[in-house]
Amino acid sequence: MRPDFHKQELIPVIVQDYQTNQVLMLAYTNEVAFEKMLETGETWFWSRSRQKLWHKGEESGHFQKIKGMRLDCDQDTLLVFVEQIGNACHTGTYSCFYDELIPFDDSDIFSELEKQIIDRKLHPVEKSYTNYLLGEGIDKVLKKVGEEASEVIIASKNSDKGELLGEIDDLLYHLFVLMNQQGISLEEVRQKAKERHQLEGNKKEFHTRTAD
């Protein structure tokens, strides 16, 4: 399956962050630029203002490493998932879509939590609970994970949704601290989840015991 460049010479390309799905920019590509993307694994476009091929990041160093690509139902629009190096927008912002017309919170809370824990590790803050846990070492972190898991179980038995949500939140936080302590990133967890869900035949079968 390929874009239909016979229908129109230039087709729009929507570029998204492959981790957060944040829309970074909209550009246009022609058949030559499209082939360049397939060959190099980086984004190439056609600059309508300069009337020439445009290798994203060639001048700024803000390259886009292609992680995935999809074609729409009419074969005339591309959706490209990338690892963004630096900022996508020439204004210096990460995304070109920063002028908010109608407020919408598209933040990835788990990515933000991971970043916050990493920042605490690199730049310790006095009386920070995160720094306290990281400083105490693996045994303390594991103890807290166990305690919070038990609290989730108790809250579940109490049939109190509000309490359960709070305990799940506490457990997730401590799991993120453990991940940081063990050098595991959120992206690695996401990739492992994808591998497991995409694995063919990965289905649990329930068997009943029959009398002999």
Curated annotation (Swiss-Prot):
Give me the reactions it catalyses.
Answer: 1-(5-phospho-beta-D-ribosyl)-ATP + H2O = 1-(5-phospho-beta-D-ribosyl)-5'-AMP + diphosphate + H(+); 1-(5-phospho-beta-D-ribosyl)-5'-AMP + H2O = 1-(5-phospho-beta-D-ribosyl)-5-[(5-phospho-beta-D-ribosylamino)methylideneamino]imidazole-4-carboxamide
Q: What is its main location?
A: cytoplasm
E.C. number: 3.5.4.19, 3.6.1.31
Q: What is this protein called?
A: Histidine biosynthesis bifunctional protein HisIE
Give the UniProt subcellular location, in the record's own words.
Cytoplasm
Q: Which gene encodes it?
A: hisI
Keyword entries, A-Z: Amino-acid biosynthesis, ATP-binding, Cytoplasm, Histidine biosynthesis, Hydrolase, Multifunctional enzyme, Nucleotide-binding
The family this protein is said to belong to: In the N-terminal section; belongs to the PRA-CH family.
SUPFAM superfamilies, A to Z: all-alpha NTP pyrophosphatases (SSF101386), HisI-like (SSF141734)
Which cysteines share a disulfide bond?
none
- Keyword tRNA-binding assigned to the entry: answer is no
Keyword ATP-binding set for record: yes
Pathway note: Amino-acid biosynthesis; L-histidine biosynthesis; L-histidine from 5-phospho-alpha-D-ribose 1-diphosphate: step 2/9; Amino-acid biosynthesis; L-histidine biosynthesis; L-histidine from 5-phospho-alpha-D-ribose 1-diphosphate: step 3/9
Q: Which InterPro entries match?
A: His_synth_HisIE, HisE, PRA-CH, PRib-ATP_PPHydrolase-like, PRib_AMP_CycHydrolase_dom, PRib_AMP_CycHydrolase_sf
Q: Which Gene3D superfamilies has this protein been placed in?
A: MazG-like, Phosphoribosyl-AMP cyclohydrolase
Q: Where is this region: Phosphoribosyl-ATP pyrophosphohydrolase?
A: 110-212
Q: Name one GO biological process term.
A: L-histidine biosynthetic process
Q: Pfam families, from UniProt?
A: PRA-CH (PF01502), PRA-PH (PF01503)
